Each structure stands twice: as C-alpha cells, then as structure tokens.
C-alpha cells in the first residue's frame, strides 16, 4: 500500500533506490524524504531524487535550516479486500547505503510493534508539515529526545544516591555537547558508573575528580564502528536504545534524529552482550586517558584475545 523512507546518503546506482522505483511502478504509494544538505552527497541525492520523481515517487525535499539525519522507513499494508494488515517500521543507526554497509558496523530494528509504527508514521507526517508531533515511544531530536535523556540520567543518579548502583553505557561516534557532558560529570559525582565507547571526537575528560567514575574506551578495527547504542541500568531492569544521533550539539538540537527503545527482551540482551564484548576487548580497544590520549589495553601474558575467544566459540 505505502512505503515511506528517509534518504540521507545512498550509494551510486543504489539497489535501494531501484527497489523503491520498482515498488512505485508496481502501484505502491512511495514517499521519500531527501536530505539535500548531506555533506559531499548533495549532487548524488539530487540526481536520485529527480530519478525517483520521474518514476512517480513523491519526493519531499530538505527543511530549510534543518537537517533530517534519521535513518527510518515505514511500510503500511492493506489486503486485497482493503483490510488492514500489520505495518512495519525500521529504525537504524546507519544509512540505506549498500556501499558503506560493507565497511560500517551498524544496527537496525525491524518491527511491527504498533507503538513504534504509530510514532514513525507521526514523524513522517511531521516531515510533510501535516502533524503536530506527539511521540509516545520513539525519542526524536528537537522534540522529546533531550527531556527523555535527562530523565534517564536523573534516574541513574537517584539509584546511585539510594545505594542501588546507577549504571550507564553509551556507545556513539562522537561526544561533544557541553550540556550532556556536564550531565555525565554530575552523574559520576553522584557515583553512577559510566562506560563510554566513543570512536571519534570525545570532549569529555576522564580521570578527573568530577569524572572518576567515567571510563572511555575507543575501538578502531576492521569495520568502522558507527552504531549508537545507549544502556541505562534502571535498577536491574535495563533500558536500551539505539538510533541515529551522536551526542553533538548539531545532532541533538539542529537535526531531526530518531531513537527507538529496544522492547524485545532477546534483542535487548543481544545489544547488551555486544556492549559488554566491546568493553572487554583486549586486542583493538584502548582507553582514553586524562590527557585525551589513546592508551592501548595491555593483555596479561597468557591471557587469550577476547576477539579470538569469541570467533572460536
């Protein structure tokens, strides 16, 4: 019946774009939000947008003064007799780009949960200027993301103050926003144990009196770590989220970003296991010290490589 997708970066001669064109030619209603301000991809995005428009796809172009960085898709279905069928939502940390997909490590959630489907539909209507945004499940930058992040951090501070052990693990590409960094410093001072896995720029300084409970890990390996995954302990009832934004001012305040909670217990456990594996890595991981220098972890002689142990398991 209907397909809605955001396009931030796609490969040249994209199989994704070709599939959307085929869907439109087969009578499906297809809407694509094209971000023309994606740096270095402006020309390719404009060319693919014109190609899709010529095939009958509805194209929505960039919002002035605002980037849409969310990586999302929605499929709404009806049966042959018009009856409603389950709809599907997809929320990812990476672009719909088969070229970078061979080089980047990302995560995506494909779900038919109604609360996520409904929120994503509201997001697409918002991008078309048709809806006052109301999000009950998704966290969306410029709307409810910052208040929810503050609430989640405050919850861990409350647990630490009660002696119940606040715990936060954050995996991202970059950590730069001063307000969120100060929130993490405050949580550390209250005793919240915080692990950060930050591949790129990190403006938080570990190893200080105000950050003594914060440890920063960096992993550079065969694939570019691109996933954004956030874990909040919540008194042994963990809340896990994944989505498109890094904790940079541009992502949190000047872009449309989408983050989903991971509600399925098995999927949540898989992401927690991934975080723990990366925190335990003793082959490619390094610490970021108080001088913001990379200090590679040293394996004790005789200690096996965590990566080898996992690959042979």
Kindly label every feature range from the protein language model.
Residues 5, 13-15, 19-20, 163-165:
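Active-site-proximal segment of RNA-dependent polymerases
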Residues 15-22, 180-184:
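A short acidic, amphipathic alpha-helical/loop segment
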Residues 7-13, 173-177:
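Short, glycine-rich nucleotide/cofactor-binding loops
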Residues 1, 128-138, 163-165:
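Gly-rich Lys/Arg/Thr-decorated short loops/hinges at beta-loop-alpha junctions or inter-strand turns
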Residues 1-7, 148-152:
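Pre-Walker A segment
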Residues 102-105:
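Acidic/polar active-site rim loop that often engages polyanionic ligands
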């Amino acid at each position: 019946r209907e397909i809605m997708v955001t396009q931030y970066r796609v490969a040249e001669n994209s199989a994704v774009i070709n599939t959307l064109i085929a869907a439109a030619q087969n009578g499906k209603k297809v809407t694509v939000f094209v971000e023309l301000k994606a740096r270095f991809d402006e020309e390719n995005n404009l060319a693919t947008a014109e190609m899709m428009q010529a095939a009958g796809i509805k194209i929505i172009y960039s919002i002035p003064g605002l980037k849409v960085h969310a990586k999302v898709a929605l499929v709404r279905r009806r049966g042959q007799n018009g009856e409603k069928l389950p709809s599907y939502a997809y929320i990812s940390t990476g672009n719909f780009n088969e070229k970078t997909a061979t080089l980047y490590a990302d995560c995506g959630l494909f779900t038919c949960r109604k609360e996520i489907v409904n929120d994503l539909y509201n997001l697409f209507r918002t991008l078309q200027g048709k809806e006052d945004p109301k999000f009950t499940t998704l966290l969306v930058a410029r709307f409810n993301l910052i208040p929810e992040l503050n609430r989640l951090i405050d919850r861990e501070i409350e647990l630490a103050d009660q002696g119940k052990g606040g715990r936060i693990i954050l995996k991202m590409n970059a950590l730069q926003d001063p307000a969120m960094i100060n929130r993490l410093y405050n949580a550390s001072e209250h005793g919240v144990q915080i692990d950060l896995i930050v591949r790129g720029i990190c403006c938080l300084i570990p190893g200080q009196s105000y950050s003594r409970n914060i440890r920063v890990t960096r992993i550079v390996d065969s694939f570019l770590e691109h996933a954004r995954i956030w874990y909040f302990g919540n008194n042994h009832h963990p809340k896990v989220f994944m989505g498109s934004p890094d904790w940079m001012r541009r992502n949190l305040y000047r872009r449309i970003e989408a983050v989903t909670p991971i509600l399925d217990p098995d999927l949540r456990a898989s992401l927690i296991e991934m975080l723990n594996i990366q925190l335990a890595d003793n082959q490619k991981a390094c610490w970021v010290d108080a001088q913001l220098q990379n200090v590679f972890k040293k394996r004790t002689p005789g200690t096996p490589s965590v990566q080898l142990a996992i690959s042979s398991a």
